[in-house]
């Protein structure tokens, strides 16, 4: 990846005087990529992480780099329904490439990753409940060092873009 970034830097690109330099933000989950983001980028974007991961990333990244954390959210006060929907949207990551090592590094176990995931991993990765509970999780990421929290509302029912959830969450998050 370091070599690839060097190749990108070697390509002449002149966006003009209004934008003399385009910022670079890397997707990063584990320490080596976070260190690369610190050394060769303006920041990082994490995905499928807990606030504890955000705190670790901030410690590695340092104070002067952008840290954007993703947080899946689901407006549902029913634990069984919330976890069912969350599992539908997240469990496939538990067997996908670099996510299992990242999740293990965050403290989740093979038992948490088994099947469609334990309640512990689902609750750790998806903020569900009412507006206050979800806003609380977003605040946890901010307190852990995130500059920005990218919420990913999980769709329910016929609202495939989760627009209603965004409408309800916006006043508490903006």
Residue positions per predicted region:
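Active-site-adjacent structural elements that line small-molecule/cofactor binding pockets in enzymes
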Residues: 1-174
């Amino acid at each position: 990846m370091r070599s690839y970034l060097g190749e990108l830097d070697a390509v002449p690109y002149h966006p003009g005087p209004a934008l003399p330099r385009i910022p670079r933000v890397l997707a990063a989950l584990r320490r080596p990529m976070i260190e690369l983001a610190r050394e060769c980028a303006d920041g990082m974007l994490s995905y499928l992480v807990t606030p504890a991961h955000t705190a670790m990333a901030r410690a590695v990244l340092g104070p002067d780099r952008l840290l954007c954390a993703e947080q899946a959210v689901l407006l549902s006060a029913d634990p069984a329904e919330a976890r069912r929907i969350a599992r539908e949207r997240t469990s496939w990551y538990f067997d996908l490439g670099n996510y299992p090592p990242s999740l293990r590094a965050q403290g989740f176990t093979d038992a948490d990753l088994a099947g469609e995931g334990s309640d512990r991993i689902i609750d750790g990765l998806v903020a569900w409940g009412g507006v206050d509970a979800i806003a609380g999780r977003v605040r946890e990421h901010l307190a852990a060092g995130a500059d920005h929290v990218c919420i990913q509302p999980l769709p329910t029912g016929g609202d495939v873009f989760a627009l209603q959830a965004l409408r309800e969450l916006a006043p508490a998050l903006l």
